[in-house]
Amino acid sequence: MSKVVVRKNESLDDALRRFKRSVTKAGTLQEARKREHYEKPSVKRKRKSEAARKRKKI
C-alpha cells in the first residue's frame, strides 16, 4: 500500500500528485485491474505467449 505524508506547507494537490506517482510506480492500480476478474491459466499462458511474440516482432 502506498503511503504519502503531507509535508508542512505542501498543498493537497501536490501530495495527491506524489501519491498517484507512487501508486503508478508500485503498479498497485494495474495489479488491481488485472485481478478484478478471474483469468483461467490457459488464457493467462496464451496472453503471455502473444505478448512475447509481439515483443519479439518489434
UniProtKB/Swiss-Prot annotation:
Region (Disordered): 25-58
Keywords: Ribonucleoprotein, Ribosomal protein
Ribonucleoprotein as UniProt keyword: yes
Signal sequence range: none
Compositionally biased tracts (Basic residues): 43-58
GO biological process: translation
Superkingdom of origin: Bacteria
Comp. bias (Basic and acidic residues): 31-42
GO molecular-function term, one example from the UniProt record: structural constituent of ribosome
A Gene Ontology term for the protein's cellular component: ribosome
Gene3D superfamilies xrefs: Ribosomal protein S8
Protein name stated in the entry: Small ribosomal subunit protein bS21
Native source organism of the sequence: Streptococcus thermophilus (strain ATCC BAA-491 / LMD-9)
Gene name of the record: rpsU
